């Protein structure tokens, strides 16, 4: 199968970490929609917030489009707009192209949120659901969004906040000295980055969603099925042993309120901003 085109305007930031992210999410494409209930819930709320926010866009970007679930909903919400679906994972866009009705009418682009292959002031609306947490530097991603937005353009995004997977983080700390959970942005740091890029009309909200799992292993398997990977420098480089899994499960069970059930917290930050 031929590769999807990479426009030659703007660089694709090709680093080992980014290649790893792209491969991980690409491999998760086939089963992603079956385990992405939280992502859909957050994205639907985000989409509802922009339906009546300003005039309809002429050109819009689904940044971190994944399997294209929200690309299709964006097209339905704004049928006269040109839609670009961009993702760092070529495997995701292959899935989108072959499984999403209307994909032929979208522009599919393999690209990096921190080096968008788009011209300055070329987009009216950027929608990004649960993608920014995988960026190496959030400031570069926000800067790129500001660059490609036209004056008056809107950016709507969601990302995980610092309290995400706090329980899993604490359980692992009781087991070893490695970093097993990614560090996520604080609400304050996100707002500071938006203001630093010149965004003045900012609506930034935070909420915590909690999900129950039959076991710690089930939680880990869901994270893996979503393509989520540990990007920290101090991550373990060895396979998870049964003994270690038992230890982290025991540590999780000792956390307050976890004796009879495994619950995971996901802090979600959502932003609606205008350039």
From Swiss-Prot:
GO terms for biological process: biotin biosynthetic process; methylation. The keyword Plastid does not apply. Keywords: Biotin biosynthesis, Methyltransferase, S-adenosyl-L-methionine, Transferase. It catalyses: malonyl-[ACP] + S-adenosyl-L-methionine = malonyl-[ACP] methyl ester + S-adenosyl-L-homocysteine. It comes from the Bacteria. Its EC number is 2.1.1.197. Pathway: Cofactor biosynthesis; biotin biosynthesis. One of its GO terms (molecular function) is S-adenosylmethionine-dependent methyltransferase activity. Converts the free carboxyl group of a malonyl-thioester to its methyl ester by transfer of a methyl group from S-adenosyl-L-methionine (SAM). It allows to synthesize pimeloyl-ACP via the fatty acid synthetic pathway. This is Malonyl-[acyl-carrier protein] O-methyltransferase. It comes from Methylococcus capsulatus (strain ATCC 33009 / NCIMB 11132 / Bath).
């Amino acid at each position: 199968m031929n590769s999807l085109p990479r426009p030659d305007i703007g660089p694709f930031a090709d680093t080992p970490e980014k290649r790893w992210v792209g491969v991980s999410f690409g491999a998760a494409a086939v089963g992603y929609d079956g385990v992405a209930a939280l992502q859909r819930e957050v994205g639907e709320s985000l989409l509802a917030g922009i339906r009546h926010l300003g005039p309809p866009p002429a050109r819009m970007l689904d940044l971190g489009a994944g399997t294209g679930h929200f690309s299709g909903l964006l097209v339905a919400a704004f049928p006269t707009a040109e839609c670009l679906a961009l993702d760092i994972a070529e495997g995701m866009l292959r899935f989108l192209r072959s499984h999403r009705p209307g994909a032929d009418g979208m522009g599919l682009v393999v690209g990096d949120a921190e080096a968008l292959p788009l011209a300055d002031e070329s987009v009216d609306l950027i929608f990004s659901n649960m993608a920014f947490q995988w960026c190496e530097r959030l400031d570069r991603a926000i800067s790129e969004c500001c660059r490609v937005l036209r004056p008056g353009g809107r950016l709507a995004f969601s990302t995980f906040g610092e309290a995400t997977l706090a329980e899993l983080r604490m359980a692992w700390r009781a087991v070893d000295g490695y970093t097993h959970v990614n560090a996520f942005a604080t609400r304050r740091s996100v707002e500071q980055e938006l203001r630093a890029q010149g965004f003045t009309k900012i609506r930034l909200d935070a909420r915590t969603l909690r999900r129950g799992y039959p076991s710690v292993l089930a939680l880990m398997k869901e994270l893996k099925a979503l393509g989520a990977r540990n990007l920290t420098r101090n991550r373990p480089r060895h396979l998870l042993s049964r003994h270690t899994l038992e230890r982290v499960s025991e540590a999780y069970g000792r956390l307050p309120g976890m004796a009879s059930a495994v619950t995971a917290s996901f802090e979600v930050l959502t932003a609606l901003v205008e350039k």
